[in-house]
């Protein structure tokens, strides 16, 4: 089950998303999430320790990654372009991240 795309699950997402998930995950987003370290400052990175944790389990990175990722990634929510490590090896720009096949810079 997990918390893929449910939006309202803070912290570790243990126990599911409790209501209002609408449509479910649509794909194998199993398991929970690791801890989402740190606050949400300009230079914060949130690390996802399991598959399917983009945009719902880490509040400060919500909206940075679109949908589920196929592998655990480091999603950078930064205002400047830096190395991203989200799979395509380019960069993150304007608080958006390249967790899909193409970067959104």
Swiss-Prot record:
A single Gene Ontology CC term: intermediate filament
Top-rank taxon: Eukaryota
Region (10 X 2 AA repeats of CG): 4-41
UniProt entry keywords in alphabetical sequence: Keratin, Repeat
Function: In the hair cortex, hair keratin intermediate filaments are embedded in an interfilamentous matrix, consisting of hair keratin-associated proteins (KRTAP), which are essential for the formation of a rigid and resistant hair shaft through their extensive disulfide bond cross-linking with abundant cysteine residues of hair keratins. The matrix proteins include the high-sulfur and high-glycine-tyrosine keratins.
Family: Belongs to the KRTAP type 28 family.
Extra information: Human have a similar number of genes as other primates despite the relative hairlessness of humans.
Name this protein carries in UniProt: Small cysteine and glycine repeat-containing protein 10
Species annotation: Homo sapiens (Human)
Name of the encoding gene: SCYGR10
